[in-house]
């Protein structure tokens, strides 16, 4: 499985090595899910599919996101899965938060390159259509009122085109 090594690493990062006397008394220790449970929860939420899609789009745009995006998403899914139900966001709000805060910011790096390409070529770069397609896909998944759509609108306003 593509995401298994990342899930193992994310859980290793979150695992506490021990509680020291200097730690905050209010520190809450959560029972973290196992690798299979983490991947199952990420899949149930649709985030593994979103990650695969985002990695594909990043590749087409020439962006190198590295493993940090995947690790960030899997870490927050692990915490979400471990949290008591009284502290959990609803699934749709949580997914919108993850996409808008942990996935889409990686795509901001495309704006300067697209602006430079537009100036040098005096025409609209193909990346603009890819970003528009991203906005459409996110709108289908998360709805027109989602925070993720607003992030995409902001990214489109950074590009040298009519939105």
What is the predicted role of each segment?
Residues 1-163:
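C-terminal regulatory/interaction module of P-loop NTP-utilizing enzymes
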